[in-house]
Curated annotation (Swiss-Prot):
Topological category with respect to the lipid bilayer: Single-pass type I membrane protein
Tissues in which the UniProt entry reports expression: Brain-specific. Highly expressed in cerebellum and olfactory bulb.
Bias kind Polar residues: ranges: 389-399
Family designation: Belongs to the shisa family.
Organism: Mus musculus
Domain of life assignment: Eukaryota
Protein name (Swiss-Prot/TrEMBL): Protein shisa-8
Keywords per UniProt: Glycoprotein, Membrane, Signal, Transmembrane, Transmembrane helix
Organism classification: Eukaryota, Metazoa, Chordata, Craniata, Vertebrata
Region of interest (Disordered), ranges: 207-248, 378-399
Primary localization: membrane
Summary of subunit composition and partner proteins: Interacts with AMPAR subunits GRIA1 and GRIA2.
Length: 399
């Protein structure tokens, strides 16, 4: 019995010692330096290494500069964890570095950023007005308006003076004076014409007895048969005076002349060819030389024999002269005496100048006949007609 009682006491003591041990263990686990809290930390770390589906989400926050950073999702590949600090957050792939966003408190606007609005300035509507100040403002406005008006008036006056003294205004005054000077004075009767009336004559240019038709394309001023021509004799000018208006009465002769002149100008403008149809001119045909009979070369000695200026030392051939036109041409003419120079040349047949052949001299009357054979041969070889030589005469001369 005693032994049983002793065992019961021991068990009671042990039962009282167990709650004390449990209490001590709980106290050690609650301390920060104890090892009892290690299993809880391992559980939190184990649950933080697993990323949620679709990536972690960083909440919006205010950074250290007081700027609001909007929220963002960490869903780019392996960067699916929200890491960093409460004032600077970013996405990372390391699960143990995951940020516990529930411990941060910078989700609201910081107090130092809220400076507040300045108080609105209350306008005192019951304050009395200052009449002196209002009068000063009115005086300033009036002075400025008067000054602006004076400036505008000065500018307008200057523009008016410049326009009045401009060259355009001077031209207007000059034009007015010209119109006044154009007013005609008392008209004087026109002097009578000095020459005979040439109203029905047509002037045709002629030269050396050959009519020259006036070409239709000439630039000379065409005159009609009813237009009077100017007199060849000098006289006073017969120009009309300036006519200022149509109310003045014109002289009968001048009115008739003006009417005829206007009709002539109108006729030349309407039908310029009518004048040539009414007064046709004689057109000359192409000028040609008369046909000449070529002379044989054996007639040349007879021509030289009849020429009084034969070259020195020339002896006419002895024999009968052939019956040619030269015989009849020289039969009725008296023989001319030889000049003294030819007598001296016959005495001394040697030429006066060395290296120079004696010149052959011909008579003016025999000169065309001497070159007739050469001209005929030249024209026949060239195959063209006679050559026209231009001279200063009005009629062309053909050789």
């Amino acid at each position: 019995m005693e032994r049983a009682g002793a065992r019961g006491q021991r068990c009671g003591r042990r039962s009282h010692g167990l709650p004390l041990a449990l209490r001590l263990a709980l106290l050690l686990a609650g301390s920060p330096s104890g090892r009892a809290g290690a299993p809880e930390e391992q559980e939190i770390a184990g649950s933080g290494t697993v990323a949620p589906a679709g990536g972690d989400r960083c909440r919006g926050y205010y950074d250290v500069m007081g700027q609001w950073d909007p929220p963002f999702n960490c869903s780019s590949g392996v960067y699916s964890f929200c890491c960093g600090t409460c004032g600077y957050r970013f996405c990372c792939h390391d699960g143990p570095r995951r940020l516990d966003q529930s411990r941060c408190s910078n989700y609201d606007t910081p107090a130092w950023v809220q400076t507040g609005r300045p108080p609105a300035r209350a306008r005192d509507t019951a304050a009395p007005r200052d009449p002196a100040r209002e009068r000063s403002h009115t005086a300033v406005y009036a002075v400025c308006g008067v000054a602006a008006l004076l400036v505008l008036v000065g500018i307008g006056a200057r523009l008016g003076l410049e326009r009045a003294h401009s060259p355009r205004a001077r031209r207007t005054v000059t034009r007015t004076l010209t119109e006044l000077l154009k007013q005609p004075g008392p008209q004087e009767p026109l002097p009578p014409p000095l020459g005979p009336p040439l109203g029905n004559c047509v002037q045709v240019q002629m030269g050396d007895g050959v009519l020259r038709g006036s070409p239709h394309n000439s630039t000379d001023k065409k005159r009609l048969n009813n237009a009077p021509l100017g007199s060849a004799t000098p006289g006073p000018p017969r120009g009309p005076r300036l006519q200022g208006g149509g109310s003045l009465t014109l002289q009968p002769d001048y009115a008739k002349f003006a009417t005829l002149k206007a009709a002539a100008l109108k006729a030349t403008e309407v039908a310029p060819q009518d004048f040539y149809q009414r007064f046709p001119s004689t057109e000359t045909g192409p000028r040609t030389l008369p046909a000449r009979v070529p002379r044989p070369p054996e007639d040349l000695p007879a021509l030289l024999d009849a020429c009084p200026w034969a070259p020195p030392g020339y002896v006419p051939p002895a024999g009968p002269v052939s019956s040619v036109p030269y015989a009849a041409w020289t039969a009725g003419r008296p023989a001319r005496p030889l000049p003294r120079s030819h007598l001296v040349a016959q005495v001394s047949p040697a030429p006066r100048r060395p290296n120079h052949a004696p010149r052959r001299q011909f008579s003016v009357e025999k000169l065309p006949e001497a070159f007739s054979a050469q001209q005929a041969s030249f024209y026949s070889s060239a195959g063209r007609g006679p050559r026209h030589l231009s001279t200063n005469s009005k009629a062309e001369v053909t050789v």
